[in-house]
Amino acid sequence: EVTTLVWAVSALCIISTLNGFEYKVPDNIKKILFSGEAMPVKHLNIWRKYLPDVMYVNIYGPTEITCNCTYYIVDREFQPGDVLPMGKAFPNEKVFLLDEEDKLITERNKNGELCVAGSALALGYYKNREQTAKAFVQNPLNDRYLEPMYRTGDLAYYNELGELCFATRKDFQIKHMGHRIELGEIEAAMDKVPEIV
């Protein structure tokens, strides 16, 4: 009897896409924790429709910080196109946003690179000093002592409620005719279309 699921978002989406709940709705699940990519609200809402009393927890974290550094307990309804918050840092982690000049971002609705530090941070990439030197760097906000941090390459922002939210990947930016375009914004717009699952 399974009471807790810790699954990749893609696994949860397979169940909702293939109408798995029409076949069977699990009886004993109390908690569902998911990570690996941004959870499409459309799919989360399908799960919540069939399992409304379950605690849903969005977990974020790259492998370089031992996979988990933030969590968000879903505490309200979300509409398609809304962004599910990433939540707050685990007690032994630091999670913060830096702008292109390595200045701390605290204001709302401004994208910055998500950076992480803490006791679970990896030491670098095995036999890859060049990549390690690019991604694992001294925290520019700390000039007092050695504090390595990891540049995730993820862009995030604080929403109107002050919650940390994933925007897109830094390497998903393209320039077209001098304009910076976030491919993640196109993906988010498509998520609002009910016919696209």
Show where each model-derived region lies:
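Adenylate-forming
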Residues: 1-85, 92-94, 99-104
